[in-house]
């Protein structure tokens, strides 16, 4: 008995021929048609068919969601129903709850052809099979997951060979990986023009398929130990050009790793500077309170000695001005800068070649030595511009020197006979002239950049607005003056404002502004109105933005950096002179340049007889 009925047999129940069926018929569920049931079976079509598809009612088998006995005949028409399982996202049922499985019945398995229609739910990921098994990304045959391919990195021993081809059954052996790669591209991959193009990789059952020949040839580099693409900065090599391009971004200055490392280093340096400044500010405040505001009070000897060893500026020279201490703020800063400059000069002049060598190392010049001739080509040098990064970098050199030599700035000045440092300095014997020229050019450019920044900062400090007198002083006018308000006595210009004076009047008296005079364009000596809140907010915003620029740098720090760079330039110049002098000594001492006395006399005679003598008449 078979349930494989033609779908058209459900359209007209009257014309169905008698057919044996199961015990549960469909007469009650499909009663809208004109047909009748014959026993427990189904009716088949007669020879004459009269179909009216437009007149089919909603209760017909075509529109019913499922028959009352859940027979498989309704599975073909359930998709067009309003309540079909496909629209509800449910799986179709082929058997009722009370029925037994057809496969478990006594009938032969070959007499049944059960339709197994699989409908997936929209929100479901798994797939339900007729047998009840569920699979999720696994192989349905054996249930095993396809193993992930792992490619081993190429080592040095892999480059020694021999190199065997593992493409299917090919067993050709080559001496070099280049020959193996050419063999794979020409013989196994082929070309479209030769009608033998293969876009699937059969190396050890890799089975990777591409859409272009360039893609499969690029993929073959994974299997072949060939790295023809070399990095210009580091000794690494790569198989594909895109790998080299990706790697080259590591050496860029704006790489996230480099930026993060530089930011962390700057943060540590700033934290160290803050701790150092905080300690000394606290000690200086105690020292000021004890010596200036309360002169009778004296510190204990141990505390005073401890402060003298830690303070960066000697304040003992300022004790003569303790009476008018509040009246001389500029004198205090000038003396501090002067004393600090003396200490810095001692610090740099005491034969300190370690700092110069450290600066050359950190700027990737490697001691200007020929020990590593390709070292400069493998490092990316920074630009010789005095910006924020360069400011912090030079500050770190000075901080490291202070931390390693904390008491050297208190030492006395060396004697004058030891001043020429180039006579006592020892330079390396093997010097790379190319690195020497590059270093000299770099630090000269950096010195010029520091000079420009120093001039800009010094100009800002020089033209700082000074507090001036609010009201102009009115001069005493003599009674014998006939000119009254408009004249002046003794050639001295007036010090009060005059609105109607001509513009060129002040040109005859350029000193009028120096004696408290008022400009020609000032109409009154009354104070101007206070600035509005908006102007104040604008000024605060501009001031906060200026703090972010390099103008916030201290002038003494810029001078310190200038002196450091000048010391490096002097070191390089002395090294260059020493090298030239040594070469001259070597050339003079060589036997090729030695002449005998007779040869020298002959040369002198030739030089003397070069021009003819003019006889006097």
Curated annotation (Swiss-Prot):
UniProt lists compositionally biased (Low complexity) regions at 63-84, 289-307, 409-426
Sequence segments annotated as region (Disordered):
1-91, 242-307, 405-427
SMART domains documented for this protein: ZnF_C2H2
* Gene Ontology biological-process annotations: positive regulation of transcription by RNA polymerase II
**Cell compartment(s), UniProt:** Cytoplasm; Nucleus
| Entries under InterPro entries matching the protein | pacC/RIM101 (IPR050806), Znf_C2H2_sf (IPR036236), Znf_C2H2_type (IPR013087)
Q: Does the keyword Transport apply?
A: no
Q: Which SUPFAM superfamilies match?
A: beta-beta-alpha zinc fingers (SSF57667)
Q: Which GO terms describe its molecular function?
A: DNA binding; zinc ion binding
Q: Where can the motif YPX[LI] motif be found?
A: 471-474, 611-614
Query: Basic and acidic residues bias: where?
Result: 242-256, 265-288
**Location, primary (coarse class):** cytoplasm
Note the zinc finger regions (C2H2-type) by start and end residue: 163-188, 199-223, 229-251
What Gene3D superfamilies is this protein classified in? Classic Zinc Finger
Q: Which UniProt keywords apply?
A: Activator, Cytoplasm, DNA-binding, Metal-binding, Nucleus, Repeat, Repressor, Transcription, Transcription regulation, Zinc, Zinc-finger
The answer to whether UniProt assigns keyword Iron to this entry is no
Q: GO CC terms on record? A: cytoplasm; nucleus
The entry's comment on post-translational modification says: Activated by C-terminal proteolytic cleavage by signaling protease (probably palB/RIM13) at neutral to alkaline ambient pH.
Q: Which family does this protein fall into? A: Belongs to the pacC/RIM101 family.
| PANTHER family for the chain | PH-RESPONSE TRANSCRIPTION FACTOR PACC/RIM101, PH-RESPONSE TRANSCRIPTION FACTOR PACC_RIM101
Q: What does this protein do?
A: Transcription factor that mediates regulation of both acid- and alkaline-expressed genes in response to ambient pH. At alkaline ambient pH, activates transcription of alkaline-expressed genes (including RIM101 itself) and represses transcription of acid-expressed genes.
What assembly does the database describe for this protein?
Binds to DNA. Interacts with RIM20, which binds to the two YPX[LI] motifs and is required for proteolytic processing.
Please report the name of this protein according to its UniProt entry.
Answer: pH-response transcription factor pacC/RIM101
The species this protein was found in: Debaryomyces hansenii (strain ATCC 36239 / CBS 767 / BCRC 21394 / JCM 1990 / NBRC 0083 / IGC 2968) (Yeast)
Gene this protein is translated from: RIM101
């Amino acid at each position: 008995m078979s349930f494989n009925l033609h779908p058209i047999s459900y359209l007209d129940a009257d014309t169905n021929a008698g057919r044996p069926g199961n015990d549960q018929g469909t007469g009650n569920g499909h009663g809208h048609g004109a047909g009748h049931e014959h026993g427990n079976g189904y009716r088949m079509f007669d020879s004459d068919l009269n179909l009216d598809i437009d007149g089919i009612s909603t209760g017909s088998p075509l529109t019913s969601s499922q028959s009352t006995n859940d027979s498989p005949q309704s599975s073909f028409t359930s998709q067009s129903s309003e309540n079909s399982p496909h629209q509800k996202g449910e799986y179709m049922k082929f058997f009722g709850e009370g029925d037994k499985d057809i496969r478990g019945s006594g009938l032969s398995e070959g007499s049944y052809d059960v339709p197994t229609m699989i409908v997936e739910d929209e929100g479901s990921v798994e797939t339900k099979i007729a047998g009840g098994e569920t699979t999720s990304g696994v192989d349905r045959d054996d249930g095993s997951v396809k193993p992930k391919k792992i490619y081993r990195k190429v080592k040095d021993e892999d480059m020694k060979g021999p190199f065997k081809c593992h493409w299917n059954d090919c067993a050709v052996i080559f001496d070099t990986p280049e020959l193996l790669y050419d063999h794979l591209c020409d013989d196994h991959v082929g070309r479209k023009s030769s009608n033998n193009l293969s876009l699937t990789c059969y190396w050890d059952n890799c089975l990777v398929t591409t859409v272009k020949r360039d893609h499969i040839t690029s993929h073959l580099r994974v299997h072949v130990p060939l790295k023809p693409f070399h990095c210009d900065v580091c000794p690494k090599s790569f198989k594909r050009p895109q790998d080299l391009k990706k790697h080259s971004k590591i050496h860029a200055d704006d790489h996230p790793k480099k930026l993060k490392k530089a930011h962390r280093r700057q943060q540590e340096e700033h934290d160290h500077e803050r701790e150092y400044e905080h300690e000394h500010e606290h000690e200086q405040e105690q020292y000021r309170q004890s010596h200036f505001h309360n002169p009778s009070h004296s510190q204990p000897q141990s505390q005073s000695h401890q402060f003298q060893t830690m303070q960066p500026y000697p304040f003992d020279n300022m004790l003569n001005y303790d009476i008018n201490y509040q009246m001389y703020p500029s004198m205090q800063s000038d003396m501090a800068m002067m004393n600090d400059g003396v200490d810095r000069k001692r610090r740099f002049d005491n034969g300190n070649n370690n700092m110069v060598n450290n600066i050359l190392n950190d700027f990737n010049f490697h001691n200007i030595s020929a020990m590593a001739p390709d070292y400069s080509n493998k490092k990316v040098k920074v630009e010789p511009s005095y910006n924020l990064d360069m400011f912090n970098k030079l500050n770190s050199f000075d901080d490291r020197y202070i931390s390693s030599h904390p008491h050297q700035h208190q030492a006395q000045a060396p004697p004058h006979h030891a001043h020429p440092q180039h006579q006592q300095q020892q330079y390396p014997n093997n010097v790379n002239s190319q690195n020497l020229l590059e270093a000299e050019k770099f630090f000269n450019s950096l010195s010029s950049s520091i000079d420009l920044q120093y001039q800009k900062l010094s100009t800002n400090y020089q033209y700082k607005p000074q507090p001036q007198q609010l009201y102009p002083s009115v001069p005493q006018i003599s009674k014998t003056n006939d000119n009254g308000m408009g004249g002046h006595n003794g050639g001295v210009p007036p010090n009060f404002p005059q609105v109607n004076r001509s513009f060129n009047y002040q040109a005859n008296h350029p000193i009028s502004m120096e004696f408290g005079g008022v400009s020609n364009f000032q109409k009154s000596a009354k104070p101007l109105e206070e600035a509005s809140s908006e102007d104040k907010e604008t000024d605060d915003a501009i001031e906060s933005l200026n703090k972010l620029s390099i103008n916030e740098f201290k002038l003494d720090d810029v001078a310190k950096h200038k002196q450091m760079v000048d010391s490096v330039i002097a070191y390089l110049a002395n090294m260059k002179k020493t090298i030239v002098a040594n070469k001259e000594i070597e050339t003079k001492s060589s036997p090729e340049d030695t002449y005998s006395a007779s040869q020298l006399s002959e040369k002198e005679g030739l030089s003397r007889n070069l021009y003819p003598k003019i006889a006097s008449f």
